[in-house]
Amino acid sequence: LDHPGLILADAGDTLEHYFRKIGKPFDQLTFTPDADGVIPVLDREWFEDDIVARTRDFLRATFGVGTLEENVRFIEESLGKDLRKYFMTDFYKDHLQTYKKRPIYWLFQSQKKGFSALIYLHRYTRDTVNVLLNGYLRDFLHKLHSRIEHLEHVQATSESAREKTAARKESDALKKTLRECEEYEREIILPLAQQRIELDLDDGVKVNYLKFGKALATIPGLAAKEED
C-alpha cells in the first residue's frame, strides 16, 4: 500500500529492511507487516494479532473504516463461511494449490490442529521458531490453562445446570487441545528452537520445508522422490 511491487523478498528480511525500502517513517505508513513475522491461526481470538485481526486491519487500511464490516461481509459471503473458519480449514489448501505445493507461507501446526501459526518464508531467521515458541505457543498453553481453571470454577459454583454442562464440554475439549499442544511444544517445537535451523533459499522450498519435519503441516507428496 505504501510502495509499488514486492518489498520483503530476500531471505531474513525484517521490518527494518521494510522501512528502509519504503523510505517513510513509521507514523506515515498506511499498513505495516506483522512485527515478528508469526501470525496465529486459531479457532478463536486467543491473540490480538491473529490472522483474522490482521486481515481486518488490512481491509481497514485499504478501504477505510467506514466500509470495513461491509467488506468483511462481502468476503465471507463469497467464501461461503466466516473468515476464521476459512483460515482454519481452507486457506492453506488454497495456498498450496496456487503455489503447486511449494508454499511461500509455511504453516506450523500441531497434529490435530489445536495450534497453528503462519510464517512468511522470506522473513524466516534462525530465531523464528524461538519467537513462535516463546511468543505464541507457550503463551497459548498459559491461556488454555487459565480458561480451563475458569471453566472448572463455573462447574463448581454455578447454579445453572445448562451453564455447568456447557462449561464441562468446553473444558473437556480444551484439555484435549492442551495435552496435544504440550506434546507439540515438548517433542517438536522446543528441539527445533534449540537447533536454530538455517535455510538456504537456493535449495528450494522442498528441501527447506522438509527440515522441519512434523512441526509443519503435511504437504501430500512433498517427501516423494520427484524433481524439485
Region annotations inferred by a language model:
Residues L1-D228:
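Terminal accessory regions of large proteins
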